[in-house]
């Protein structure tokens, strides 16, 4: 995860970007949290798009249901790797269009184990002052039950929470609706 955070913070620095609306989907909620800890002055807003919202010391795996944690830890201990994504994973994400599903499947890769085990840095008061929003995708078997937990967490933190009637890959299946919400957030 540190590499993913560094990639984004380096882009912000070397391109001298400021007033950035940084958006992260799913696992990338961990990454954007770490980016906000390291480069808060460059960010205008952070958007958790059906994404993990970690608290201090939480890694991605700690946010999964206990049975899934146990299964994955056993698999890692046995094979020192985490299972590749199943061939039907795009459908699981709510992608029913065959061409889009093939496009997504060709680009899916397993994460390094450390991305599941390392907690992101949260930063201090300056990081916490960056405005944040959450987009809650309400349909589909993958995201809806898990990420609704983080929509609730965001709401309790006082963030603006938007609902999108789409699956976890809404930016691909519902691009116009996704863009409309992001533009509303960016315009304040």
Language model feature labels by segment:
Residues 1-21, 37-38, 63-65:
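Active-site loop/oxyanion-hole signature of alpha/beta-hydrolase fold enzymes
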Residues 23-24, 28, 32:
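Gly/Ala-rich beta-loop-alpha elbow adjacent to hydrolase catalytic centers
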Residues 33-37, 179:
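Short, hydrophobic alpha-helix immediately C-terminal to the catalytic nucleophile
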Residues 37-43, 47-86, 115-116, 121, ...:
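Flexible "cap/lid" loop of the alpha/beta hydrolase fold
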Residues 106-125:
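Active-site nucleophile elbow and catalytic-triad environment of alpha/beta-hydrolase enzymes
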Residues 128, 134-136:
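Short beta-strand/loop motif that positions the catalytic acidic residue
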Residues 138-172, 177-180, 184-185:
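Conserved loop-alpha-helix segment in the C-terminal half of the alpha/beta-hydrolase fold
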């Amino acid at each position: 995860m540190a590499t993913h955070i560094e990639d984004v913070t380096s882009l912000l620095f070397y391109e001298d970007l400021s007033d950035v609306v940084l958006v992260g989907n799913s696992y990338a909620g961990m990454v954007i949290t770490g980016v906000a800890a390291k480069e808060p002055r460059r960010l205008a807003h952070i958007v958790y798009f059906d994404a993990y919202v970690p608290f201090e010391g939480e890694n991605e795996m700690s946010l999964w249901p206990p049975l899934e944690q146990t299964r994955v830890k056993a698999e890692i201990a046995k094979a020192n790797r985490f299972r590749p994504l199943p061939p039907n994973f795009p459908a699981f994400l709510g992608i029913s269009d065959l061409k889009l599903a093939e496009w997504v499947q060709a680009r899916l890769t397993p994460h390094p184990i450390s991305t599941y085990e390392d907690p992101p840095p949260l930063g201090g008061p300056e990081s916490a002052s960056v405005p944040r929003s959450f987009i809650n995708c309400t349909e589909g078997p993958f995201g809806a039950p898990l990420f609704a937990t983080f929509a609730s967490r965001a709401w309790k933190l006082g963030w603006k929470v938007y609902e999108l009637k789409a699956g976890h890959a809404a930016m691909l299946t519902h691009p116009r609706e996704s863009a409309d919400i992001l533009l509303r957030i960016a315009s304040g």
